[in-house]
């Protein structure tokens, strides 16, 4: 007799393993981007890829499904990067993958290259910094009362000095600066640079 077989039905492995959920960028610096995602209970681990040189390249593969964070280092400042993550499950020597989830992240704009402080008198200190061509202006903050408080915001990137007055004599003060760039309704900030200055006794 003759046996008739039906056509094969192909089941994609990815349909059996759900895509990674809540994938997002959680923190950025001028050279790092940290990616995080939710745990996939059915996965063995996760594969993280970066788009570079015109193609996708695997930059990390976790060995378990409890590692839910990865920091990509060595990046250029003020640059947008594309990443994608997928879960994988290995069983019986066979590895199945979920669909990809894509994420984009942008590194921070650079900060000023130099930030210094000097005592002017018993009640004032002068802060100086180098020009940042990528900035619209700068925000200067002082640490007082247990927290950082903005004490000046420049309206341009050519103002490169600020004198802080009304200070106590012979006292050390902490200051920090960050660059900002305004484009339309969007404002981007750099990381901080800090300095400690003591007034004249």
What does each of the following model-derived ranges do?
Residues 1-2, 52-55, 91-93, 144-147, ...:
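Solvent-exposed strand-loop boundary residues in beta-sheet-rich modules
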Residues 1-3, 72-91, 164-184:
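Beta-strand-rich modules
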Residues 3-41, 77, 94-134, 169, ...:
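Pro/Thr/Ser/Gly-rich low-complexity, intrinsically disordered linker/stalk tracts
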Residues 20, 37, 48, 72, ...:
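An aromatic-rich alpha-helical recognition segment common to small helix-rich domains
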Residues 34, 50-51, 60, 72-73, ...:
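Short, surface-exposed linear motifs at loops/turns and structural transition points
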Residues 40-60, 67, 84, 100, ...:
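Extracellular low-complexity, O-glycosylation-prone stalks/linkers
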Residues 66-70, 90, 158-162, 182, ...:
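Repeated polar recognition positions within modular binding domains
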């Amino acid at each position: 007799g003759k046996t008739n077989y039906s056509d094969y039905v192909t089941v994609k492995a990815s349909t059996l393993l759900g895509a990674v959920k809540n994938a997002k960028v959680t923190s950025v610096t001028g050279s790092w981007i940290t990616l995080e995602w939710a745990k996939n209970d059915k996965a063995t681990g996760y594969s993280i890829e970066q788009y570079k040189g015109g193609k996708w390249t695997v930059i990390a593969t976790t060995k378990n499904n409890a590692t839910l964070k990865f920091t990509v280092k060595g990046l250029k400042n003020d640059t947008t990067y594309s990443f994608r993550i997928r879960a994988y499950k290995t069983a019986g020597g066979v590895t199945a993958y979920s669909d990809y989830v894509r994420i984009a992240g942008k590194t921070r704009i650079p900060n000023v290259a130099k930030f210094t402080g000097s005592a002017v008198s018993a009640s004032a200190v002068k802060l100086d910094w180098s020009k940042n061509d990528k900035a619209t202006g700068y925000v200067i903050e002082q640490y007082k009362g247990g927290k950082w408080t903005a004490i000046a915001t420049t309206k341009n990137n050519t103002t490169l000095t600020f004198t802080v007055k009304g200070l106590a004599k012979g006292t050390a003060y902490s200051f920090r600066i960050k660059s900002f760039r305004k484009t339309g309704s969007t404002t981007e900030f750099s990381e901080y640079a800090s300095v400690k200055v003591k007034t004249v006794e």
